[in-house]
A protein has these predicted regions:
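Hydrophobic/aromatic-enriched cytosolic interaction surfaces used to assemble or bind macromolecules
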Residues: 1-281
């Protein structure tokens, strides 16, 4: 199986196989993309992106045809909500209909969700806690065209935020680190997710660009400092807010020391999110 992550600036491809209850990574590669080929997660130049992806596949001698893709875009809407508990939690159509009505999005959006728990209202009516994601269909359609162009079979579309949230809430030790801010670092964006009580309670996506920081080589670090300051002010303003216990990075964290030094004034412990134990190389 191939796992492909495409952002506005990069293609990342990982080739892995299931071995028992683990995933063994057999190969990985990355390519830089010319600006404009992908815009805010949308594939704007399918032939050019296909050529780059196909070159990776041919160079690595990859023969697998099944693939999943991870999508990140500010046009993807995230929302936490409480909904009446249906008679059967397997009735996903009913849950998706309630989510669609709650979020006020059209049928042109793909709805996905995670059930984060159950509760009751003041009248003892049973409710479910939902973390919902609405992804524009035309965003997905671009990846369908891309994979068709190079003969890959698209087996799944993962919203990056959902994937990492499932990892966080299914890792028991993570609950002890909350409230925790998880930050995805990328050359083109920052994605900040706040977790409390073993669930995601807020998510914010920031587009970043070198031109906003005089094309400085350390523009990502500057953008992190600026946006984290605003995020922490927002967190403090929330009713009943608790101080952060930890900040965790994932993504492009090769310059972790510089990243952590840039936010040391916030006096919150900083670490890199470790790969799950089920993934081996």
């Amino acid at each position: 199986m191939l796992s492909i992550d495409i952002t506005d600036r990069q293609i990342k491809l990982v080739r892995g196989v299931h071995s028992g209850n683990k995933i063994r990574v057999q190969d990985a590669d990355m390519r830089e993309l010319t600006l404009g080929m992908v815009s805010n997660g949308y594939i704007t130049d399918v032939p050019m992106v296909a050529a780059e992806l196909n070159d990776i596949i041919k160079t690595k001698g990859i023969t697998e045809k099944d693939a999943i893709v991870s999508i990140t875009s500010s046009s993807i809407v995230y929302k936490e909500m409480l909904l009446p508990k249906p008679k059967s939690l397997k009735n996903t159509a009913a849950i998706e209909a309630m989510i669609q009505a709650n979020m006020g999005v059209s049928k042109e959006f793909n709805i996905s969700f995670t059930i984060a728990g159950e509760t009751e209202d003041e009248e003892k009516n049973k409710l479910i806690k939902i973390i919902a994601t609405a992804c524009p269909q035309r965003l997905v359609d671009g990846y369908v065209r891309l994979f068709s162009h190079i003969g890959l079979s698209l087996k799944g579309v993962n919203i990056a935020n959902n994937s990492v949230t499932r990892l966080i809430i299914n890792t028991p030790k993570m609950a002890d680190r909350m409230p925790m801010l998880l930050i995805q670092i990328d050359k083109g964006f920052l994605n900040m997710n706040l977790y409390e009580d073993n669930q995601i309670v807020f998510s914010r996506y920031f587009n970043i660009d070198p031109s906003d920081y005089d094309n400085a080589p350390d523009y990502v670090i500057r953008a992190l400092s600026d946006n984290l300051f605003r995020m922490i002010q927002f967190i403090k303003s929330r009713k009943g807010a608790k101080p952060l216990k930890e900040i965790m990075f994932y993504g492009d964290t090769g310059n972790f020391i510089e990243l952590s030094n840039a936010i040391s004034s916030f006096n919150v412990p900083v670490h890199v999110l470790a790969a799950p134990s089920t993934v081996i190389s």
